[in-house]
Amino acid sequence: MTHPSRRSLTLLGLAAAVTPPVAGAAEPVDMLLVLAADVSRSVTESKFKLQREGAAAAITHPDVVRAITSGPHRRIAVCFLEWATAGQHAVVIDWVAIDGEAAARRFGDRLVEMPRSFSGSTSISSAIDFSVAQLDRAPFAAERRVIDISGDGNNVSGRPAAPARDEALAKGVIINALVILTPIEESFRPGHTNPPGGLERYFQENVIGGPGAFTVVAETHRSFGRSLTRKLIQEIAGAEFRSAG
């Protein structure tokens, strides 16, 4: 029987080292998380700045980083996108693994540097559809696939939000929401930002869903960062929180 030489084994080892991963093989992470931010017309430039800076502060918060690194794989994958009118959405930061403080800091720094994508009307349904598409093409693998959608008004563009929500849930996606409130006296469209029953109730009934789905309220855009920090800790840890209904 002929045995491979030491040189042959060495060459085989070198070849294996430079051979790209098999197509379709995805890196394991504890969660795939899409952060979907509303940049419709009701989000003024000052509010937009608060949102971006708040999101950067939240992802780099020590308690959030601790939650990220506490799972079995000690990392999650995140994609940040913005949305407005139906068909109007853009990936701001494509899929990246966050596995500690340094990676979180790089993500946050990039986030505050990127320009605003656009502004327009409000299509939560289109945002959900686009977010699901990003989850489907992620180069990472995780059992938990979560959309974290933030918004300050109800769906007024495109198809209703609930059917888009239901289709996402059928694919095993969890949708949580950060509901940004607007005092009615400051709203240029009170029926949009302050619908009957309240905006949080609207999101609970039409947007969120899946095991343990929940909403967190930001009383104003100024509290966006604090609210998102609290939300991410619960989301990443997978802890039970206030669920829909």
Where on the chain are the PLM-derived regions?
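N-terminal secretory signal peptides and thylakoid transit peptides that target proteins
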Residues: 1-15
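Second-shell loop/turn segments in exported
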Residues: 36-46, 94, 111-121, 151-155, ...
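Solvent-exposed loop/turn segments at secondary-structure junctions
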Residues: 39-43, 85-88, 151-157, 180-185, ...
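VWA/integrin I-like adhesion module and closely mimicked acidic/polar interface patches used
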Residues: 154-202
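C-terminal "exit" segments of structured domains
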Residues: 215-245
